Amino acid sequence: MFHLFFLVLIIGFNAGHLFAKNDQVNNTKKNQFTFSWQFDGTDSLRPRGGSTLGQDVTLETEPDEKWFAIHEGGLTKKEQDRRAILAMEGQYRVSFDFIETINFKNPHMPSRPYQSWGTEYVFPVAITEDFISLQHIMVMYFKNMGAGDGDFDMGKPMVLKHWRQDWKFQDTTLNVFSGFNTWTKEKKSPKSVTGKWSQAVYQVDDSPRYQSLGSWVHKSNYSAWRSEETWR
């Protein structure tokens, strides 16, 4: 069973409303575009979708047991945080939205927005008391048109190493992105990081992307990590 990939880390970390519409699952022409909905079908910037057909997925409709584990009685705040991070493990249907938001040339005609989707697995690759590493792996099945009308053959899976996120409790040394492919080591005092977790995000080749400190918040209906302001 697949989950919607809703990593609510109020930093926009893979954020976006993912919809359980059958038309999006099947990648037909009637996609529910997440960020480009304001362009209608007659607009020159009307959104477009993927040209391939993917594996049919069955979405979970009930909360996962990992969610309930976060709210067990008697847990410390740190243990709640750890369980929230570990709850990201699993199978997901993820959406990818590409849309130009900044124009550096005048005149300039932006490309039409594009949206596609895929299936992704999240695995913990390191777990200690103060450190958790989660590796994202794309596992894509493509439907190939068969000989008969409306007949499809499911091809072999395409497995792609995707991004990685490392979480460290009360981290005092950050590798902060400072723009133009440069990063700066930033030291923090132990007092300033009390109760906080750093999230370091890495590219598919394990090179750094960005890192930030933040605090987890746990409510009755959601858990969220709020990042401090940082370059991305």
Question: Across the structure, where does each feature detected by a protein language model lie?
Answer:
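Extracellular structured ligand-interaction cores
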Residues: E89-Q91, W117-Y121, F131, L160-R164
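Extended amphipathic alpha-helical segments with heptad-repeat/coiled-coil character used for oligomerization
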Residues: A126-F180
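Generic short beta-strand segments
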Residues: R93-I102, I137-V139, E228
